[in-house]
Amino acid sequence: LSRRQRQMCIRDSYYTNPQYPEFLRSKYQAIEDNEQRWESYQAEDADVVLVAYGISSRISKEAVNMARAEGFKLGLIRPITLWPYPVKAFETCKNAKAFMTVEINILGQMVDDVKLAVENKYPVGFYGTFFGLPEPEEIVAQAKAMLEKEGK
């Protein structure tokens, strides 16, 4: 490329429309307002709400059924969109005393998302596995232990 062509590329690679930042801000706000997707399963009256997606969510749903059969109020939020994160889903959990992410990793990648969604008003725990899949019995036991630890 000639010097002039390089200068044109550099100059033209920046978007200089002054309305563009506001357009982007309003576009992202509309997406955040309208595109949150989730599935809620018995979370409205739950004492502890599990947050899981993928295989973990199917195992967590089994844990919810098992806990409910024992009289322990466990619920589940399954995020369908990870961006925008479904913060509106957490508004329906009026009785929740704690939240716990169930993940097939040892890092707790969703813990911070859940803490932000509940605005740090509730304890947020993590149950993860590295080798193999989580067991419903282990999830229920961990949720009960978390509730006892919080003294609620």
Where are these regions (language model features)?
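An N-terminal assembly and electron-transfer interface module characteristic of large anaerobic redox
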Residues: R4, I80-A89, E137, L147-G151
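Peripheral docking tails and interdomain loops at the edges
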Residues: E103-K152
